[in-house]
């Protein structure tokens, strides 16, 4: 198994993220998919697989995930033409719910602060 340096691994992940961010809106033209934003790319040390974490605005995450999974092979072939490397990682899409969790936590904190302020004013 061939391993790459962490620096090269990160540069490649960044390049894949930039390329996919350009390709996805162009190749998956569907208003029902909403706005897909790529959060991060995690590559395996041997560069065989890439976990692509995304969020979506204005559509159901499950619908966007299904569409991305269906087009993963096509996006892979487009990346292969762009990257000019021997092995392009297989793409595995994952919905990143951390943004939603962050918003929920922020709302809970706001509610707790508001409740404390009401208690102090009594």
UniProtKB/Swiss-Prot annotation:
Transmembrane segments: none annotated. It is found in: Cytoplasm. GO terms for biological process: maturation of SSU-rRNA. Pfam families: RBFA. SUPFAM superfamilies: Ribosome-binding factor A, RbfA. GO terms for molecular function: ribosomal small subunit binding. GO terms for cellular component: cytosol. Keywords: Cytoplasm, Ribosome biogenesis. One of several proteins that assist in the late maturation steps of the functional core of the 30S ribosomal subunit. Associates with free 30S ribosomal subunits (but not with 30S subunits that are part of 70S ribosomes or polysomes). Required for efficient processing of 16S rRNA. May interact with the 5'-terminal helix region of 16S rRNA. Belongs to the RbfA family. Monomer. Binds 30S ribosomal subunits, but not 50S ribosomal subunits or 70S ribosomes. PANTHER family: RIBOSOME-BINDING FACTOR A, CHLOROPLASTIC-RELATED. This is Ribosome-binding factor A. It comes from Polynucleobacter necessarius subsp. necessarius (strain STIR1).
């Amino acid at each position: 198994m061939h391993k790459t340096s962490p620096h090269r691994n990160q540069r490649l992940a960044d390049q894949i993220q930039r390329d996919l961010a350009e390709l996805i809106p162009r190749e998956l033209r569907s208003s029902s998919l909403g706005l897909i934003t790529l959060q991060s790319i995690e590559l395996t040390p041997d560069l065989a697989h890439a976990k692509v974490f995304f969020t979506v605005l204005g559509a159901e995450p499950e619908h966007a995930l299904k569409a991305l999974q269906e087009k993963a092979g096509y996006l892979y072939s487009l990346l292969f033409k762009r990257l000019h490397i021997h092995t392009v990682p297989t793409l595995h899409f994952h919905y990143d719910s951390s943004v939603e969790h962050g918003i929920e936590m922020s709302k809970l904190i706001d509610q707790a602060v508001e409740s404390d302020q009401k208690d102090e004013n009594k």
